[in-house]
């Protein structure tokens, strides 16, 4: 048994709540649809109760949750239901435990191997796919990249494979350190990847590209540092389309120059006005 959490929600809110749990690092989420019209979600965000409480309070302030011992012995069964992710025709993300493609990739395609472990970032979530698409469009040889809320490191590692000179990941989850380093090593870019639990204030020089696939409250909380550190481009995701005006206002004077919407989730490319 593992220390987990239980959230009672509604059919109307279950998708949003689940997506936010995935973004917080859930690896497996069970759903129990009850006859009284409620939906019970069970998952685990780790054994640090103080950290879990702060994450829930910040990202899901309106939900009621309780501690509950849960059986995650079958958690890895989700791996049986994922497949290689086509980001673009030339960029694919392969779960590390899959040896062959469910769909053929072009012979010259870039294929990133990722094992997220207990972190967020396999490449299949709409926010990750949108971030990867925009990242692929702006990475130039020699670029420097900051991946805020890096999780598995899929965004920063992909940037390095695509030609970035150096990438730094930040996260508040200690598991991101080991997992992202392992993924960087698996893709041959460990020497150019650094990951830190330190706040953004410690970074002095801006990066060519900053990518932040995190939820709206955190984007707003970090907006000053995101603006400061984005030398050329800022990619933000983790917000539902049509509900991101407050995020963009917080990021002014940066302006949106491109937007991708996948399954209702918006990913934006911002830059400084000319």
Tell me the role of every PLM-derived stretch.
Residues 2-103:
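N-terminal auxiliary segments of SAM/dcSAM-dependent transferases
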Residues 26-28, 164, 231:
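A structural motif
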Residues 60-63, 89, 108, 165, ...:
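A short helix-to-beta-strand connector/capping loop
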Residues 73-141:
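SAM-dependent Rossmann-like transferase core, predominantly class I methyltransferases
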Residues 118, 122-199, 203:
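Conserved SAM/SAH cofactor-binding pocket of Class I
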Residues 138, 172-273:
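S-adenosylmethionine
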């Amino acid at each position: 048994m593992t220390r987990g959490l239980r959230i009672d929600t509604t059919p109307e809110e279950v998708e949003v709540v689940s997506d936010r749990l995935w973004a917080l690092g859930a690896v497996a989420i069970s759903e129990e649809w009850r006859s009284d019209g409620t939906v019970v979600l069970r998952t685990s965000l780790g054994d640090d109760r103080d950290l879990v409480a702060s994450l829930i309070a910040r990202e899901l302030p309106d939900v009621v949750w309780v501690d509950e011992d849960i059986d995650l012995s079958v958690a890895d069964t989700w791996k049986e239901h994922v497949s290689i992710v086509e980001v673009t025709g030339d960029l694919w993300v392969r779960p590390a435990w899959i040896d062959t493609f469910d769909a053929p990739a072009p012979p010259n395609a870039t294929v990133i191997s990722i094992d997220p472990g207990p972190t967020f970032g396999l490449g299949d979530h709409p926010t990750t796919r949108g971030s990867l698409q925009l990242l692929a469009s702006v990475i130039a040889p020699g670029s420097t990249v900051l991946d805020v809320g890096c999780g598995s490191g899929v965004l920063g590692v992909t940037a390095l494979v695509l030609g970035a000179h150096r990438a730094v990941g930040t996260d508040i989850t200690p598991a991101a350190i080991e997992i992202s380093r392992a993924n960087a090593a698996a893709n041959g870019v460990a020497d150019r990847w650094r990951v830190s639990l330190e706040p953004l204030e410690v970074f002095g020089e801006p990066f060519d590209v900053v990518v932040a696939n995190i939820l709206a409250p955190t984007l707003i909380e970090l907006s000053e540092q995101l603006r400061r550190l984005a030398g050329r481009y800022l990619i933000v995701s983790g917000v539902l389309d049509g509900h991101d005006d407050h995020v963009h206002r917080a990021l002014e004077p940066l302006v949106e120059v491109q937007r991708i919407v996948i399954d209702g989730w918006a990913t934006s490319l911002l830059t400084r006005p000319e």
